[in-house]
């Protein structure tokens, strides 16, 4: 089962497509609007932690230890009794502020997307889906192609 919260009700354990709940604001937990239109101050009171599943805090504030090797709680990976696995997980980072251990919808920053870096052009302040610039190659940092098509690779 997915550790990510449902985008409709905010609860862990199912996906939005399977949710029967009325859509609630992710910030204040009330119907009729979404978080971006919420007039209430940002809060974690109704948010559900992706690490432990409890409400009232987000992953970056969670005190429950979770092993990145076996995904069990109570210990961290360097203390894990299971054989070490090659990690294919990327660290969670916020697309809004660039900070670690939380996602944009959990971000407490009010000042828009200033820390956001576009994956298409590499500039700050917008996301790839809104980019008007040419693609930037991660290999040579030139525009017009992506790394898999790089002539310098």
From Swiss-Prot:
Cellular-component GO terms for this entry: cytoplasm; cytoplasmic stress granule; P-body
Tell me more from the record: Present with 96655 molecules/cell in log phase SD medium.
Q: Which top-rank group of organisms is this from?
A: Eukaryota
The name this protein carries in UniProt is Zinc finger protein GIS2
Lineage, top ranks: Eukaryota, Fungi, Dikarya, Ascomycota, Saccharomycotina
| Source organism | Saccharomyces cerevisiae (strain ATCC 204508 / S288c)
User: Gene name on record?
Assistant: GIS2
The entry's keywords: Cytoplasm, Metal-binding, Repeat, Zinc, Zinc-finger
Q: What are its GO biological-process terms?
A: positive regulation of cytoplasmic translation
Q: Name one GO molecular function term.
A: mRNA binding
Q: Where are the zinc fingers (CCHC-type)?
A: 4-21, 23-40, 47-64, 65-82, 92-109, 116-133, 135-152
Query: What is the protein's known function?
Result: May act in the sexual differentiation pathway.
């Amino acid at each position: 089962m997915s550790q990510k919260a449902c985008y409709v009700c905010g609860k862990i354990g199912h996906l939005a497509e399977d949710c029967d709940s009325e859509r609630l604001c992710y910030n204040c937990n009330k119907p009729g609007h979404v978080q971006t239109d919420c007039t209430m101050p940002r809060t974690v009171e109704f948010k559900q932690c992706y690490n432990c599943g409890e409400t009232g805090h987000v992953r970056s504030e969670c005190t429950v230890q979770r092993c990145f090797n076996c995904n069990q709680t109570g210990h961290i990976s360097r203390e894990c009794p299971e054989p070490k696995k090659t990690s294919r997980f990327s660290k969670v980072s916020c697309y809004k502020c660039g900070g670690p251990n939380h996602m944009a919808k959990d971000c407490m920053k009010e000042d828009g997307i200033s820390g956001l870096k576009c994956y298409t052009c590499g500039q700050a302040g917008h996301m790839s889906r809104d980019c008007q610039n040419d693609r930037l190659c991660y290999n040579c940092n030139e525009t017009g192609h992506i790394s898999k098509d790089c002539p310098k690779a």
